[in-house]
Amino acid sequence: MPSKQLKNKPLVEAILEVHWALQKQAGDMQVDPHYKLLLGRMFDRLLGEYPVPEELPQAFIPDQISAYMVKQRFRVGANDWPLIQIGPGIMTVNDTAKYTWTDFRSRSIAAVGKLFDAYPKVGSLNITSLILRYIDAVEVDFTKLRVWDFLQDKLKLSTSLPDNLFADSTVQRMPRHFHWEAVFDCAKPSGVISLRFVTGEKEGKRSLIWETVLSSEGELPSLPDGFAGWIDAAHAITDDWFFKLIEGELERRFSGE
């Protein structure tokens, strides 16, 4: 079933992360001996749909000390999204305002297929983790509303401190910063799902930011053929949690009602 479309969606970024095993060297260093060739071959395969390559500053860090660090970006247009990023042991697919599930799913499946097609020695490509991450944010004036009151009223999350902690105290009731996180085991797909809420800023305005992350490692499907099933199952959970959390006033606000 396609995901609901929100006119004013709170999405900051949707990210797919694919990690693969690196070769250990002296000390704690890890390298992908095929990275340079992989990058060139991915360039050839991505250029049609992502014609704007962008070398990141960390590209100049030696590969021996830059494991799992993205170094090259491929954009659909200048300063535009979506994009794909590559580094030793890592590939990501990222989207922001233009995100739709159908498009993101298609791009993610295609990117994983291209990774396997481009990897110089595909038999040695050992995928170690798959991660689907959603970052959302909603503007909140925390000078007028306590963060746990907002969480309780708008997102159905009960978390608070007893009022008597602040009785006859010089400690202010409004927290300077708030961070809450929980991680749960997941059976389908096999892995864990985490939910994190923090106070921060979006576009210069005080906001509540939350991340919903489905991460699988170890027991992974056969790739690349099994990837579509994995991302569908991961999205089914993250999407279900998102809409259950915002049900009510926030969903109406994000829908533009």
Predicted features along the sequence, with ranges:
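Short, highly charged C-terminal tails/helix-capping segments
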Residues: 124-135, 248-257
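Hydrophobic alpha-helical segments and helix pairs
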Residues: 79-119
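Extended intrinsically disordered, low-complexity coil regions enriched in Ser, Thr, Gly, Ala
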Residues: 26-48, 102-124, 220-237, 242
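N-terminal low-complexity, intrinsically disordered segments
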Residues: 1-86, 257
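Aromatic/basic-lined ligand-recognition segments
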Residues: 1-3, 70-75, 126-203, 213
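Long, compositionally biased interface segments
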Residues: 205-257
